[in-house]
C-alpha cells in the first residue's frame, strides 16, 4: 500500500464506515481522523464520537453544517430552479461538495495527506467526493475502500466487524430494507423491492410525508418572502436558511407534498431507481418560479431555463467546484437582483398551488395587460407591423415554393 501517514474519514458511525475505520488502521497502518457532518439528517450524530473513541481515534470532528449547507449550497441551487432530468431535486448531489470541502479543510488543519469515504464503486457519490477533493487539494490521496477490498456484502462486513470487535449491533431494531440517505433537503430510498421497476413502493417506506390520501382535508396557506432570490421569511417571520427549509419540510410533509419515484441515469452509466421525499424543496421550487414570473425579464427567464439543464447536470455529476459551474452561478446570481417579493401558496393533499404573488420590482403592468380599456397604454395597431416583420422569412420561403408538408 502507498505511504499514508494520516487520513480523514467521512464517518457516520454506521456499519460501513466503522469497518472502513478499522480497515484503514490495519491496511495502511496510519492515524485516522473522523469527520461526521450534521446536515439535518435527523439522526443523533454524537454516538459517532463514542464509537470513534472506542476504536482509538484521537482527532474527532463532529460539525453542525446545516446553515452552511442551506445558505451556500441549497439556496444557490434553487435560484436556478434546478431539476435533474425533469424531476429530481438533487438532494443527495448537493450535499457532497460540502462534505468534500470540509474533508479537505480538516486534512489541511490536521496535516493529513489522505481522505477516505464510504461510497461504493457503482454509484455517483465516489465521483462527487473525489472531483471536489481534487479541485480543492490537487495532491490529496483518496482512499476508496469499496474499490479495494473484498468485503462486498453486508454479511461480510458484519463478520469483519465481529472479528475485530467493532462496536456494531448485529441484532437490534429492525433494519430498513432500503439504502437511505438524508439531509435537510431530502431523504432517499434505493435498493430492496425498488430494484424491480414494476413493483410499487410500500407506504411504510416513507418517513417524512403523509400519504396525500391521508393529508388534511383543509388546505394550508403560507406566504414566503424573497430577497434576491432567497427565502428570508415565512408568514412574515424572518428565519435563517436552515430554519426555513426545516419548517417547510414539516408543513409540506403534513400535507403530503414532495414524494417522488423515478428512474435516473447515473453518471457511471447505469440506470437507478430511487424514491425521494423533498417536501420543503418542492414548495421552494414552485414558489421561486412564481416570484420570478413577475420579476424577471422574459429573455432572462428563458435563458435561465436553457442553462438550468446544464447546471443541474454539473451538480448531479459532481462538478460543483468546476469553473463552468462557478461561471454559471455568477450569471444565475446576477439574475436574482430584482427577485424580491412575496408568494402566497395553498398546500392541499400533495399539491402546491400558487394563489398570489406581489413585488415592488414586478414587471407585471395591469394597465397594459388588462382586457378592459387601457386608455391608450398599448396601441393594438402596432401589432400588425410586428407580425408582418416576424412573418417575413416564412413568406419569402413560401414564395420560393418551399413545402411545409
Curated annotation (Swiss-Prot):
ATP binds at residues 10-18, 37, 118. This is Argininosuccinate synthase. It comes from Pseudomonas savastanoi pv. phaseolicola (strain 1448A / Race 6) (Pseudomonas syringae pv. phaseolicola (strain 1448A / Race 6)). GO terms for molecular function: argininosuccinate synthase activity; ATP binding. It catalyses: L-citrulline + L-aspartate + ATP = 2-(N(omega)-L-arginino)succinate + AMP + diphosphate + H(+). The gene is argG. InterPro entries: Arginosuc_syn_C (IPR048268), Arginosuc_syn_N (IPR048267), Arginosuc_synth (IPR001518), Arginosuc_synth_CS (IPR018223), Arginosuc_synth_type_1_subfam (IPR023434), AS_cat/multimer_dom_body (IPR024074), Rossmann-like_a/b/a_fold (IPR014729). Homotetramer. The lineage of its organism: Bacteria, Pseudomonadati, Pseudomonadota, Gammaproteobacteria, Pseudomonadales. NCBIfam families: argG, PRK00509.1. Belongs to the argininosuccinate synthase family. Type 1 subfamily. One of its GO terms (biological process) is L-arginine biosynthetic process. Its EC number is 6.3.4.5. GO terms for cellular component: cytoplasm. Its main location: cytoplasm.
